């Protein structure tokens, strides 16, 4: 059935979230995995996505509203990593472990922009080093 992770006391199926994200007209590929946030229990959802057209076509507020309508709040990815092309292994599997290890740190993501759904916000915002420091420093309550 695929990988799962726990967030907010719930089991989240990465395959289910991936399949839902792939129904969005502006998402061509999606890989979902759990990442750790300091001072929280479990793993928060993160999705590496490839836009169907370009990054400019993604409306992050609309994407978040849509995701919240399609799945329970605990399953909605808190972080997005936007990739031009998804890397695969020699057997055409997505490199989920590497993505999980790089998490939502923009310094580890190369040219891939990373976005976060911050508590109280109604859209995803780009993760800068300042936003990353605020997340790790506990400014936001997840």
Language model features with spans:
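Flexible coil/turn and secondary-structure edge motifs
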Residues: 105-108, 132, 139
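AMP-binding/adenylate-forming catalytic core of the ANL superfamily
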Residues: 1-75, 90-94, 98
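AMP-binding/adenylate-forming catalytic domain of the ANL superfamily
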Residues: 71-93, 113-137
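A short, polar/charged loop-to-alpha-helix boundary motif
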Residues: 102-115
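Nucleotide phosphate-binding site architecture
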Residues: 81, 100-101
